[in-house]
């Protein structure tokens, strides 16, 4: 584990063109330090942040692989990824973070196109058939689904094409044609046609079996997903007596895992296809204490609150944009005892935590989990609990004996420096600390604020150091 963390990452030959792995050339240990520091800067003021949970082997972890197809200047079929910020295709045969078998299948598909006279789709002319290929590989089951995204439902010799593909890769368990005839950048269309097999794969996670279709949302890193969801269930502290709501439930992953440890679980999701899969997943796992609804989660919670229904725990797993204030308002009105927030964006998480704090919810603990090695994303599980007015104790306080000076100072400049160096690895000056203090409305000595001459240029505290100093001030309860 330690040996792996300190070695330098192999540099990908298309790293600059692709742009998908922002941390190329950085050792895995450095990546983890960077991500943990980012989470700490944003969340330290809310509560306890645990060390980040990294991977033992941070390579080839993506069990969902997407390739876009195009033609080069000579008319040859190419497959790969879009160059960051463009729709120009960067040819890729293998990727250090993608499932190796999936990459092999994509190369085989590209090789079959010429013999079957299948043209790749051109976005400019809107001519051609094959637009994308999506591969999903069941980590625990080994099942493989191939999704061929075409611009037209007409797929000449499709049965022979599938036979030729399976001759090279007999491990493929199902092949689906997805029709996307829209002139948009969306990868998948709305219609699926099963060409071979059952049209979906299954995978196991935290003791539950899940049905995964072409359209299903399912986390792409199975090893870390197990850790992420186990941590979420552990944070909830379920004893078998709780009533639980799984908001943004998708295909029911968190809700079904929680069901074995709770009295009753309700899952709410707006996507109809996901709800259908969730219901099938409940039947597949013979889980009888869970019910799914195809509704807006916020409106659903408002109805529950109006009916005076009680909830012990709400799990929420919103998109990268975070939750909406409307949803958080509804959550506060329902007033569950605990909220477990699974976040894929620490910036929007911090924003939502500020809103929830105003509504009476305090973050207790946070666990960062590295779901995407070599990329700048980081997931975080956060436990919040309801802070009621009676969550107080009475004390006798003699104001005459209170030392106001010590209460105001809280921490010395050296203590702040030591904290910032220990927690963030940054060295800060007294000047920078005083600048941040002034921004936060804390009075400081004159010597730390004024230049020695009128024309002197005073250096301004960089944003990264300002955030770290603010975290220290919050730690010492000075802001």
Language model feature labels by segment:
Residues 405-418, 429-430, 444:
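Short, charged amphipathic recognition helices of the HTH superfamily
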Residues 6, 22-120, 135, 140, ...:
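Extended interfacial segments that mediate partner engagement and assembly in macromolecular machines
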Residues 12, 18-21:
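Short cysteine clusters
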Residues 70, 135, 142-151, 209-213:
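Short, aliphatic-rich beta-strand segments
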Residues 444-454:
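Short Lys/Arg-enriched helix C-cap and helix-to-coil transition segments
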Residues 2-5, 157-406, 413-414:
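Rossmann-like S-adenosyl-L-methionine
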Residues 412-424, 434-440:
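DNA-recognition alpha helix
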Residues 410, 458-479:
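Phospho-regulated, low-complexity intrinsically disordered regions of nuclear gene-regulatory
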């Amino acid at each position: 584990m330690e040996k792996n963390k300190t070695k330098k990452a192999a540099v990908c030959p298309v790293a600059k063109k692709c742009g998908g792995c922002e941390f190329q050339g950085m050792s895995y240990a450095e990546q983890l330090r960077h991500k943990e520091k980012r989470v700490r800067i944003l969340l330290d003021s809310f509560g306890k942040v645990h060390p980040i949970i990294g991977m033992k082997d941070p390579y080839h972890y993506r069990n969902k692989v997407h390739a876009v197809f195009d033609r080069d200047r000579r008319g040859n079929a190419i497959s790969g990824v879009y160059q960051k910020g463009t729709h120009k295709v960067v040819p890729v045969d293998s990727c250090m973070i993608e499932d190796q078998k999936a990459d092999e299948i994509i190369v085989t598909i590209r090789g079959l196109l010429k013999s079957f006279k299948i043209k790749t789709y051109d976005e400019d002319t809107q001519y051609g058939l094959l637009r994308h290929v999506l591969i999903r590989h069941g980590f625990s089951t080994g099942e493989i689904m191939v999704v061929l995204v075409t611009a037209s439902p007409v797929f000449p010799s499709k049965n022979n094409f599938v036979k030729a593909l399976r001759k090279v890769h007999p491990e493929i368990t199902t092949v689906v044609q997805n029709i996307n005839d829209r002139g948009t950048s969306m990868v998948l269309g709305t219609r699926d046609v099963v060409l071979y097999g059952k049209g979906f794969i299954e995978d196991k996670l935290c003791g539950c079996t899940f049905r995964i279709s072409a359209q299903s949302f399912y986390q792409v890193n199975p090893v870390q997903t197990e850790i992420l969801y186990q941590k979420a269930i552990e944070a909830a502290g379920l004893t078998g007596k709780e009533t639980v709501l799984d908001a943004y439930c998708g295909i029911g992953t968190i809700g079904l895992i929680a069901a074995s440890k709770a009295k009753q679980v309700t899952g709410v999701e707006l996507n109809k296809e996901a709800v259908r899969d969730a219901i099938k997943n409940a039947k597949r796992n013979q889980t009888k204490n869970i019910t799914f609804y195809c509704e807006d989660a916020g409106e659903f919670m408002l109805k529950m609150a109006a009916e005076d229904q009680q909830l012990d725990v709400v799990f929420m797993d919103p998109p990268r944009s975070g939750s909406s204030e409307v949803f958080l308002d509804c959550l506060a009105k329902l007033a569950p005892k605990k909220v477990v927030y699974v976040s894929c964006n620490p910036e929007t998480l911090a924003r939502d935590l500020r809103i929830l704090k105003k509504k009476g919810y305090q973050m207790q603990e946070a666990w960062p989990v590295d779901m995407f090695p070599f990329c700048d994303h980081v997931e975080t599980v956060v436990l919040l609990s309801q802070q009621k007015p009676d969550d107080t104790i009475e004390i006798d306080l003699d104001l005459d004996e209170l030392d106001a000076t010590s209460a105001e100072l809280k921490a010395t400049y050296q203590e702040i420096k030591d904290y910032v160096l220990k927690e963030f690895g940054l060295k800060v000056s007294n000047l920078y600390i005083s600048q941040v203090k002034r921004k936060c409305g804390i009075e400081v000595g004159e010597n730390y604020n004024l230049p020695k001459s009128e024309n002197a240029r005073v250096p301004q505290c960089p944003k990264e150091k300002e955030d770290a100093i603010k975290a220290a001030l919050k730690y010492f309860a000075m802001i």
